[in-house]
Amino acid sequence: MHNDAPKLLETLWQLQKDPDFNAGDILLKTELSADEGQALQVQLLERWLNEGEALGGWKIGMTSGESRDALGPGIRPFGFVLASRMLPSGTDIPRAQLFRGGVENELCFIVDSPLGENATAESAQAAVRRAAPGFEINQKRLPPGCNAGVRVADNLSNWGIVAGTAVAAPADLKDLAVTLYRNPEDVDPRTEQAVGRIESAGHIDDHFESLAILARRLHDFGHRLEPDQWVITGAYEKHPFEIGEFRGHFNKGIGDVHVTLSG
């Protein structure tokens, strides 16, 4: 465990409760490994649970785009999602509640059966038969320049998940494509602006392999994937917070998800 672990944990906890908390320079001066950051993150989860929150699901990080391998080749840390922040499509979230951050289109899997230590891509596919179009709501609590292990300790910036209607998970997601649309409040509601479209191939790790890696890593830290948990496996298109509606469209029959940030 890192020498400053108690102080780091308290600082991270204060940021979880108030992202505008003045953390000083301890986070910028700290270098954490993936495992050190993960251990601190699990303690953050325990604090939330002790306050009466429930665990709702998980994310696996550093699987897509520029974040891949930020902690080293093949290292894929996890983050937790609070049940109170698992929100349905169409949710309206006050913009002021979120501080800094952005929305990211992510495929959201719903776990059907437990998955843990011996997970493989094949067993993961069998354990998560449903998938939904989703948004991850990311909150930037850390000062710029923190090392990747500190980002893990801060729960990989997760604030919550918005998910649409679940469908049978396609067996082959290699040609999944996701388009993000935005509709600022000062634009006619019938008019949307496409932010961008990203295809799975070459952008993101195999989803089912990511689920297996997540299950095995959770086992290393005393957890596993449980029925009805939501799991997100990596970002597609993203956009900074702004007032208005966002829509994500997922092909392959997965469908749409909506979230509004209100003033």
Pin down the residues of each PLM region:
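Catalytic-core "active-site belt" of small-molecule-metabolizing enzymes
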Residues: 2-206, 212, 240-243, 247, ...
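A conserved acidic, glycine/proline-rich C-terminal tail/linker
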Residues: 207-243
